[in-house]
Amino acid sequence: MRSNQAIPPTLVPKLLHRFSSSEGYEAQRDLVPAIRALRERISQQEVERLVIGVITNSDDRVPEVLSSFGLNVSPLRYGIPFEAIALQEKQYDIDFHCMSYDVGVEKPDRRIFNAADIMLSHIIKARYHETVSESDLESWQKVYVGDEVAKDVVGAAEAGWNPVLLDVEGKSTEIASLEDIPQQTLEDLFEDHASVRVGSIRNLVTWLTGWNWETR
């Protein structure tokens, strides 16, 4: 635009829509079916429980963006009151959001991961009717998947989470590749490796579940 040219009245609404929806972003291939495949496999194991959340250095557009990709997104956000019955009556692809916009700090600050711990305790109480202590939360295998070493891998590790680097281009060769590691329990995996990397969400879910994508 020229310096003296007026801003078109439709420009701002169009930009707001673009960056509040899938129009302005690109999702990992098979993101939605991968998350649902993970939930399906875990639901078949009566002892296991699965909570999926988002921890992000972003604002309150995130739930809307994820919804526009076809994910079924929970209304649960850090710092926002919620109705427990909403978690009891419906199954979501994404159970909660911890956004720096709400928490007040950004990754790698451990407080944003601590906020996710609080969200986890709320979900356990609402969904499973159990009150959890800090020691109870320690018994959960908390895995964080992100694409930046400094913010995601280091931040998660320092907060007591198990980090998985989403390394699409395969550049972080100093970190063990999950695709090269035989399937085992998460506990054994992170006893042997401080962190691991994976080329895609699809490969991560395949490693975790043994999911056969060719039959889907």
Language-model regions, residue ranges each:
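Asp-based, Mg2+/Mn2+-dependent phosphohydrolase catalytic module
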Residues: 32, 36, 41, 53-216
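Surface-exposed cleft-lining segments at the edges of enzyme active sites
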Residues: 13-25
